[in-house]
């Protein structure tokens, strides 16, 4: 892992410490092209949004040779939770964190959208309950990871984003994509809420922060402010 070294002088003594940078990896799932993210530091792995390629996700986690300590969900549409229980069972049931507003959707195909008629080609997704509900705008510290959960509803009722200030990045789920935004024609979607959440919670982050969305390529806050047609 890379290191940042800092120093200062106090009472003629050298104080020396370091910060270990997190690395982020992505795999793309075959259903809906959903992005699953893996956050890795020197201690552990955090998984975000386990999509449909369950065995690939499990193999990727094992390749890091570190414990999986948490699974974070940006929202609970089926393409973001498809392999949730498969991954839990493969890694001794790490705790799952979810928005309280969408917690019941984990076991409801109608609410997580896998039960819609247009999705007859996939199984109904039914997952076990999550262990934890997010506390919005409260800092989290998990095995060396530090992040804050931001409310970004609009694509779904309880959608959230995760900002890692030390690593200058934000994972936005299906709220903000490169040069577009999440769909707002789904149950519980609301266009005005989505635009407001992006403006208030994401566009107030530093311009250079990297954006990792639930589908498609990464981008930056600056690029989306300047090039996203929904904000011009």
Curated annotation (Swiss-Prot):
<feature type="binding site">
    <location>
        <position position="75"/>
    </location>
    <ligand>
        <name>Zn(2+) 1</name>
    </ligand>
</feature>
<dbReference type="GO" id="GO:0016787">
    <property type="term" value="F:hydrolase activity"/>
</dbReference>
<dbReference type="GO" id="GO:0046872">
    <property type="term" value="F:metal ion binding"/>
</dbReference>
<feature type="binding site">
    <location>
        <position position="215"/>
    </location>
    <ligand>
        <name>Zn(2+) 2</name>
    </ligand>
</feature>
<feature type="binding site">
    <location>
        <position position="80"/>
    </location>
    <ligand>
        <name>Zn(2+) 2</name>
    </ligand>
</feature>
<dbReference type="Pfam" id="PF00753">
    <property type="entry name" value="Lactamase_B"/>
</dbReference>
<dbReference type="InterPro" id="IPR051453">
    <property type="entry name" value="MBL_Glyoxalase_II"/>
</dbReference>
<protein>
    <recommendedName>
        <fullName>Probable metallo-hydrolase M6_Spy0554</fullName>
        <ecNumber>3.-.-.-</ecNumber>
    </recommendedName>
</protein>
<keyword id="KW-0862">Zinc</keyword>
<dbReference type="InterPro" id="IPR036866">
    <property type="entry name" value="RibonucZ/Hydroxyglut_hydro"/>
</dbReference>
<keyword id="KW-0378">Hydrolase</keyword>
<feature type="binding site">
    <location>
        <position position="174"/>
    </location>
    <ligand>
        <name>Zn(2+) 2</name>
    </ligand>
</feature>
<feature type="binding site">
    <location>
        <position position="79"/>
    </location>
    <ligand>
        <name>Zn(2+) 2</name>
    </ligand>
</feature>
<feature type="binding site">
    <location>
        <position position="174"/>
    </location>
    <ligand>
        <name>Zn(2+) 1</name>
    </ligand>
</feature>
<dbReference type="InterPro" id="IPR001279">
    <property type="entry name" value="Metallo-B-lactamas"/>
</dbReference>
<feature type="binding site">
    <location>
        <position position="155"/>
    </location>
    <ligand>
        <name>Zn(2+) 1</name>
    </ligand>
</feature>
<comment type="similarity">
    <text>Belongs to the metallo-beta-lactamase superfamily.</text>
</comment>
<feature type="binding site">
    <location>
        <position position="77"/>
    </location>
    <ligand>
        <name>Zn(2+) 1</name>
    </ligand>
</feature>
<keyword id="KW-0479">Metal-binding</keyword>
